Amino acid sequence: MRSDVMIQARNLTIGYRQGRKVKKVHTGLSFALRQGELTCLLGPNGAGKSTLLRTLGGTQAPLTGDIFLEGRSFTTYTEKEISRKIGLVLTDRTMAGGLTVFDLVSLGRHPHTGFFGRLQKRDEEIVYQSLDAVGVAFKAGSYVAELSDGERQKVMIAKALAQECPLLLLDEPTAFLDVVSRIEMMDLLHELAEKKGKTVLLSTHDLEQALLLGDRLWLLSRDKGLVCGATEDLVFSGEINQFFARNEIIFDRKNGNFRPQKREGKKITLKAEGELFFWTQNALTRNGFQLEEQATLVLEACSPHAFRLWENNQIKKTFTSFEQLIAFIKQKELFREREDILPEL
């Protein structure tokens, strides 16, 4: 086993025992999580992501197979030892409404306190630092019952941070957060991995942020099982497209996102640079155009306030905003049967 491997599984079967019945969710899973990496677990609802996280977190026993934590069999750890090694944040709603936010996050320090669980000054500092890291330090004196779903999620992540564990397992940590908070949270978790050497595994439906900040991706589904790899390797191997694409949806490797696949589109050449190229292309493809290098129609984007539409080396129309451009290209009746030719206006 490599020295940088935090947790490893061999031939793992995960699922549930219901009396004498056994419900297998996945079989034959083998993988490793390394120190200093942020791994994003992606998959459709019902794929078994939460089951896998609970199994790795020690709250649900595997049906068969072996898990090793820092090279040692998981079964040899005591609960207290696991609580010092693994910080687990699940989507289960916490029943701690009568506690203050500070009290709840303080529970994360209990693996490090003495028999009576008394917080020392250093423990209190860590609690406040954890609250500040997720942006809810101002809620320290509030009751958990008073929090919004997003605030409660941040508090539970702060509790995991207060544990100061080398391994963090988080089930959809950004599910209830607004757009800005989602980005901030993902950036925080990536920073914990990159700068503090923590091992972070989180499940998410936010593919864009996973592609941007995930060192590795785990793709999980009932029919395909678990596919693991470096983010860019999975992009260029086609695994991302095969895993998520549907009949009319494809993964655009150039832009790193999914988009509707247009069966037929008007041909146009786009001349632009940088971010202006990206957003002009976005407007064109959204409205049924396909970019080609040698189309009859040419759109020249000089700035967000200066566009020129050419046909056969002659300027046919100018626009001073995206709004004008989009309004014009939406007039489908302006185009002849040959969709790459614009009539005289």
PLM regions with names:
Residues 143-147, 151:
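Conserved ABC ATPase signature
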Residues 168-171:
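Catalytic Walker B motif of ABC-type/P-loop ATPase nucleotide-binding domains
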Residues 57:
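Helix-to-loop junction immediately C-terminal to a conserved catalytic motif
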Residues 121-139:
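Conserved ABC ATPase "signature" region
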Residues 42-44:
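The feature captures the beta-strand-to-loop junction immediately N-terminal to the Walker
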